[in-house]
Curated annotation (Swiss-Prot):
Family to which this protein belongs: Belongs to the LPG synthase family.
Membrane topology: Multi-pass membrane protein
Matching InterPro entries: Acyl_CoA_acyltransferase, L-PG_synthase/AglD, LPG_synthase_C, PG_lysyltransferase
Official protein name in the record: Phosphatidylglycerol lysyltransferase
Species annotation: Staphylococcus aureus (strain MRSA252)
Reaction catalysed by this enzyme: L-lysyl-tRNA(Lys) + a 1,2-diacyl-sn-glycero-3-phospho-(1'-sn-glycerol) = a 1,2-diacyl-sn-glycero-3-phospho-1'-(3'-O-L-lysyl)-sn-glycerol + tRNA(Lys)
Entry superkingdom: Bacteria
Residue ranges, Extracellular side: 30-52, 111-128, 183-200, 251-271, 359-369, 472-489
Cytoplasmic side: 1-8, 74-89, 150-161, 222-229, 293-337, 391-394, 437-450, 511-840
PANTHER family reported in the protein's UniProt record: PHOSPHATIDYLGLYCEROL LYSYLTRANSFERASE
UniProt KW keywords: Antibiotic resistance, Cell membrane, Lipid metabolism, Membrane, Transferase, Transmembrane, Transmembrane helix, Virulence
EC number annotated for this UniProt entry: 2.3.2.3
Length: 840
């Protein structure tokens, strides 16, 4: 049997043992808890002195400082260039994390390796020392186990009750001398031969400190058991939790404590309350402190240090691949820590709704409690809804959270007035102020599906909140009073109203205030860029007057865009120096992210697809644009006799065509206005992707007109210079609708012939929407659906007719795309684009 097979068998046996032990613990614990009267547990909790609770929590938080001695020993042994204060802070964070999700200490060992490898040259020695620390966590327990074996601590009752623990106790006791001998004979560093012994002493003191915390919990709930028996039960319970490999020993530790004190005649309700207090004081409080420390300890400075560290090694395998993300992970720790703290705060104060409702049951002024309960619940829900926004460092989310904290403080002061909780709220508020100053964006984009999800989530949370309160009152036999007083009857709707007012007011203020922040370069800069680098088929639309411009720092590339519904809709590809497009888009996306806007590109070519892809976008084919090769275009030949017939017909009717250069007279503009108004027939003009009938816009390029024999304008088209590839296009094409003449054909034919005469080589006839979209079985579902619209809804919009019309000019078809973020909805993005096009 080779080593690989042995390792696999060992892993399977280990997993099987842990799973079987976990199932056994859960079943046994459930059986023990099923007989507990939770009402008595709550009554016992209400008797606890609040100052004793404060001292307990302080003691629980302070007890974890002892574990920091591991890291002090480690830093001194390896001569790390790191201050004692930083060691203590980082160590506290690591140990608090390890206590919750330790998996036998392996999580803590991994985090230590990640943090301290930047402070030492000898990585191999670091790993050896960390392994020694990991093992020494058991040696301290081994030393205490020896004291039970030699009857210093009396555990006879529990050993008789749980016989299998005796063998674990003996095995662990034998581990200590073996470890001491091995660590002294083969130390990780010959100059530090007694490190193993030092770590064992630290481990022993730490386990005793944890036992003292549990003992203090017992004293608070009035459990009368000798200190020696307390320690004995704790040691055996800790061994059970360690062997189970369950994070924090949850379940196994608690079961042994429950059974141990039950053998001593302690009521189960008191033991349960003692365990809950212990878990909160020794696990939850240190985690809270660690999260607060993380908000200050990690962040920009840590990220910069690691990025500049000569010890930072590129990823080469799975482990190093994960480690390569450490600078990003560490940079996010402060916001993640604060988000977790806000989440816990929300949950804690949701539970405190019970206190408000309970007080309201015995108070005649129910109206006041309606309002206070609704405010309190609204604030808790707002905290919960903005957890993700806080993690994403959104200032708007942080403001929502700060307002929520203030509302909770007000509700707390007017109801149960817990100064411990108010102190906690003040701490969270201070952390939110720090986070607000560090925030990297004003707000996150508002998306319809997110709003719907938040609404459904809010209803669900409020429903669960009501069920929780009602269920608790049923358990306490006071629900009958609640039904008579109707404290819970209407506050759901009041809560929704308060949330709507707060959310609506802040959202409106942000949109109003920061709409002024949107920057726009002047049109002269854009003209200079086009003059130097050329434009594209859409660049002439800079003169339409309905767009803003974003220019890069070097002023050699720009985008034209328009704001609509928390989105920046960009028209076409970037314009200018192609080498600057990457920098331009990065600056634009940073700008949009800061303001909390989505970015949508409309009608882009396939030339820059890789560039858009780099920014996390996906694509939807809008259709194809007809580009006519003027070098091949002609009205001669059999296939073109229709073109000649059209031109001949206009000649017979004495209808002429000419190009008028700006500036234009008022009389000429009035003639065009008359034709345009009749053509529009009270329909609204489109915007953004096309020009509008506007004298300023029209005066920027020549206009082609067709006149009748009376020299009256009957049709016109505005030219669109492209400033690249010897190409030209037309924008507005309008004619008198009452004339039964092929005026559109006439304008196009005359423009094609004129453009060819002027030396242009390409003519853009515009896009055929949804043309050639989703034609293959392998296409995306959304594109296949769009293709069916093209085929079967021609009555609503002339999709096929437009393609057929342009096809007779034998164009080359070039695809055009919608570009939008991969986490955005296609239909929502299309809707925003259409709103931009159809509204001024």
């Amino acid at each position: 049997m080779n080593q690989e097979v042995k390792n696999k068998i060992f892993s399977i046996l280990k997993i099987t043992f842990a799973t079987a032990l976990f199932i056994f613990v859960v079943i046994t614990l459930y059986r023990e808890l099923s007989g507990i009267n939770f009402k008595d547990t709550l009554v016992e909790f209400s008797k606890i002195n609040r100052m004793s609770l404060v001292l307990l929590f302080i003691g629980g938080g302070a007890s974890l400082v002892i574990l920091s001695m591991y890291d002090v020993i480690l830093s001194r042994a390896l001569k790390m260039d790191i201050s004692l204060g930083k060691v203590l802070r980082v160590s506290y964070i690591i140990n608090a994390l390890n206590a919750i999700v330790g998996f036998g200490g392996f999580i803590g060992a991994g985090v230590r390796a990640m943090v301290y490898k930047n402070y030492t040259h000898d990585k191999k020695k670091l790993v050896h020392f960390i392994s020694l620390i990991l093992i020494s966590m058991l040696t301290g327990l081994s030393l205490l186990s020896l004291l039970i074996v030699f009857h210093v601590f009396d555990a006879s009752l529990i050993l008789n009750k749980i016989t299998w623990v005796r063998w674990v106790l003996y095995a662990v006791s034998l581990f200590l001398p073996l470890f001491i001998i091995y660590s002294m004979v083969r130390p990780p560093d010959k100059n530090n031969r007694y490190v193993g012994l030092y770590c064992t002493l630290v481990s022993c003191v730490e386990w005793l400190a944890a036992a003292v915390v549990l003992y203090f919990c017992g004293v608070i709930v009035d459990v009368h058991v000798s200190f020696m028996s307390f320690i004995a039960i704790f040691i055996i319970a800790a061994l059970s939790g360690l062997v189970s490999f369950i994070p924090g020993g949850f379940g196994a530790f608690d079961l042994v404590v429950l059974l141990g004190f039950k053998t001593l005649g302690v009521p189960e309700e008191k033991v349960l309350l003692m365990l809950l207090l212990y878990r909160f004081a020794y696990y939850f409080v240190p985690v809270i402190i660690a999260l607060i420390l993380s908000s200050f300890e990690f962040g920009t400075s840590a990220k910069k240090y690691i990025e500049g560290s000569k010890y930072f090694i590129p990823a080469k395998d799975v482990t190093s691949f994960l480690m390569s993300y450490q600078k990003d992970i560490i940079a996010k720790i402060p916001s993640l820590s604060l988000a977790i703290l806000v989440f816990f705060t929300s949950m804690i104060f949701f539970v405190n709704n019970l206190t408000i409702v309970y007080d309201a049951l015995y108070d005649g002024n129910h109206l006041t409690y309606y309002l206070l309960l609704a405010i309190h619940t609204s604030a808790c829900l707002l905290l919960l809804l903005n957890v993700v926004g806080i993690y994403k460092q959104s200032r708007r989310a942080i403001i929502y959270a700060m307002i929520s904290i203030i509302l909770i403080i007000v509700a707390t002061l007017f109801t149960y007035a817990s100064y411990i909780l108010i102190t906690w709220l003040v701490i969270i508020f201070a952390l939110l102020i720090v986070a607000f100053r560090r925030a990297r964006r004003l707000k996150r984009p508002i998306r319809m599906r997110n709003l719907v999800a938040m609404l459904l989530f809010s209803i669900f949370i409020l429903y669960i909140n009501h069920i929780f309160i009602a269920g608790t009152f049923y358990a306490l036999d006071v629900y009958t009073i609640e039904m008579h007083t109707s404290v819970l009857k209407y506050y759901f709707w009041i809560t929704i109203l308060i949330i709507a007012i707060i959310v609506g007011a802040i959202a409106w203020l942000f949109d109003y205030q920061f709409s002024k922040v949107r920057i726009s370069s002047n049109i002269e800069e854009c003209e200079e860029i086009i003059d130097q680098y050329g434009g594209n088929y859409l660049s002439h639309l800079i003169y339409s007057g309905d767009k803003q411009f974003f220019t890069n720092e070097d002023k050699n590339a720009f985008l034209m865009y328009r704001y609509k519904a928390s989105s920046l809709v960009v028209l076409g590809d970037p314009i200018g120096d192609e080498n600057a497009f990457d920098e331009l888009l990065e600056a634009f996306y940073n700008y949009a992210e800061y303001l909390g806007y989505d970015v949508i590109f409309y009608q882009v070519t396939d030339q820059h697809m890789p560039l858009y892809h780099n920014f996390g976008n996906q694509f939807f084919k809008l259709g194809e644009e007809a580009i006519i090769d003027l070098t091949q275009f002609s009205t001669s030949g059999k296939k073109r006799r229709g073109f000649r017939a059209t031109l001949n017909k206009f000649d017979e009717l004495n209808i002429s065509f000419e190009i008028i250069e700006p500036p234009f007279s008022t009389e000429f503009i009035n003639e065009l206005q008359h034709v345009s108004d009749l053509w529009l027939d009270n329909r609204q003009e489109m915007h953004f992707s096309v020009g509008q009938f506007n004298e300023t816009y029209l005066s920027k390029a020549p206009i082609g007109v067709m006149r009748n024999e009376n020299n009256e304008v009957i049709a016109f088209c505005s030219l669109m210079p492209t400033y690249f590839n010897d190409a030209i296009s037309v924008d507005l094409i309008r004619w008198l609708p009452e004339l039964d003449l092929p005026l559109m054909d006439g304008l196009y034919l005359h423009m094609l012939l004129w453009s060819k005469e002027q030396g242009y080589t390409k003519f853009n006839m515009g896009m055929a929407t949804l043309s050639n979209v989703g034609q293959l079985h392998y296409s995306y579902l959304r594109e296949r659906l769009a293709g069916r619209v093209f085929e079967h809804f021609n009555g609503l919009y002339r999709f096929q007719g437009l393609r057929r019309y342009k096809s007779k000019y034998n164009p080359n078809w070039e695809p055009r795309f919608l570009v939008y973020r991969k986490d955005n909805s296609l239909w929502e993005s299309l809707s925003k684009v259409m709103r931009v096009i159809r509204h001024k």
